[in-house]
Amino acid sequence: MTLAGSKAFIGQPAPNFKTTAVVNGDFKEISLGQFKGKYVVLLFYPLDFTFVCPTEIIAFSDRIAEFKQLDVAVMACSTDSHFSHLAWVNTDRKMGGLGQMNIPILAYTNHVISRAYGVLKEDDGIAYRGLFIIDPKGILGQITINDLPVGRSVDETLRLIQAFQFVDKHGEVCPANWHPGSETIKPGVKESKAYFEKH
């Protein structure tokens, strides 16, 4: 895998885009800019009508209420057409389809979005399993890219967002395996000792 041509960097503005998506069984124009002011989870996946992909997209879609409670928008994106997306949404889940979706499914057949985010598998023209967390100011806070056979975790994505939001609000930092309610660290040489003395 190569990140050549990627414009996605931690701490920098996420590459903007505008494209057609399947939303509530219809076609709609979606842009990243319209979500300014809230966190965004952007999921790239390889192909419609495959095997791991529906398990991931359905998992995120079915738990959208938890993301909405945190004021987070979730979107999935592949290099398939919006017509392919719609056919997949209209396919029963027992037949490998998506069924009713609570998140937009973005289409971008010319590869511009997946290339900008550094997830395009150039030899096949499909996207690796990239997951990007973008903050309310449009800044990238988290990037993970999986190879094709391994899916991603909704629980870990929610945990990361909760950690970023805690830092935004309180200015303290979150140690390994932090969950809401766990101890955090005051970022300073002297201040951090209070945490380290307990652990």
Swiss-Prot record:
Q: What more does the record tell us?
A: The active site is a conserved redox-active cysteine residue, the peroxidatic cysteine (C(P)), which makes the nucleophilic attack on the peroxide substrate. The peroxide oxidizes the C(P)-SH to cysteine sulfenic acid (C(P)-SOH), which then reacts with another cysteine residue, the resolving cysteine (C(R)), to form a disulfide bridge. The disulfide is subsequently reduced by an appropriate electron donor to complete the catalytic cycle. In this typical 2-Cys peroxiredoxin, C(R) is provided by the other dimeric subunit to form an intersubunit disulfide.
Q: What class of enzyme is it?
A: oxidoreductase
Q: Which GO terms describe its biological process?
A: cell redox homeostasis; hydrogen peroxide catabolic process; removal of superoxide radicals
Residue positions of the active site: 53
- The EC designation for this entry is 1.11.1.24
Q: Which CDD domains match?
A: PRX_Typ2cys
The record's similarity note reads:
Belongs to the peroxiredoxin family. AhpC/Prx1 subfamily.
Taxonomically, which superkingdom?
Eukaryota
Q: Which UniProt keywords apply?
A: Antioxidant, Disulfide bond, Oxidoreductase, Peroxidase, Redox-active center
Q: Note the subunit structure.
A: Homodimer; disulfide-linked, upon oxidation.
Q: What is the lineage of its organism?
A: Eukaryota, Metazoa, Ecdysozoa, Nematoda, Chromadorea
What GO terms are given for molecular function? thioredoxin peroxidase activity
Q: Which residues form the Thioredoxin domain?
A: 8-166
InterPro entries registered for this protein in UniProt:
AhpC/TSA, Peroxiredoxin, Peroxiredoxin_AhpC-typ, Peroxiredoxin_C, Thioredoxin-like_sf, Thioredoxin_domain
Q: Which Pfam families match?
A: 1-cysPrx_C, AhpC-TSA
Q: Which PROSITE patterns match?
A: THIOREDOXIN_2
**Disulfide bond listed as a keyword:** yes
Listed under catalytic activity are:
a hydroperoxide + [thioredoxin]-dithiol = an alcohol + [thioredoxin]-disulfide + H2O
Instruction: Give the protein's recorded name.
Output: Peroxiredoxin 2
Query: What does it do?
Result: Thiol-specific peroxidase that catalyzes the reduction of hydrogen peroxide and organic hydroperoxides to water and alcohols, respectively. Plays a role in cell protection against oxidative stress by detoxifying peroxides and as sensor of hydrogen peroxide-mediated signaling events.
Please provide, in alphabetical order, the Gene Ontology terms of the cellular component aspect for this entry. Answer: cytosol
